[in-house]
């Protein structure tokens, strides 16, 4: 469950290390974002010579949460850290060309197939 002010790791090679959620998109008073939801983030920590810099405001898709994802068979997939993949504000395609760490099968819709194909492991 990601809400405003939540700090997340950037799970791609866009140049951001740490980002903060500033808005949960989709609905007028939506409070929480889960895996597969799009959020608005600001870059809090970035590496030198990256594609993004500190202070940039971008869209991102949540790929891992500590809360986890409940599957229809009753199992829950949980992670140690909250993580997201940064997206282009207009096209909503990933900024980075590599994804680090596993992603969940819940991202396998038409919008995020690029992220699933780049990920080293799909749980």
UniProtKB/Swiss-Prot annotation:
Sequence intervals crossing the membrane: none
Gene Ontology annotations for the cellular component aspect, listed alphabetically: cytosolic large ribosomal subunit
Stored SMART domains: Ribosomal_L14 (SM01374)
The entry's keywords: Ribonucleoprotein, Ribosomal protein, RNA-binding, rRNA-binding
Protein origin, superkingdom: Bacteria
Function: Binds to 23S rRNA. Forms part of two intersubunit bridges in the 70S ribosome.
The family this protein is said to belong to: Belongs to the universal ribosomal protein uL14 family.
Protein name per Swiss-Prot or TrEMBL: Large ribosomal subunit protein uL14
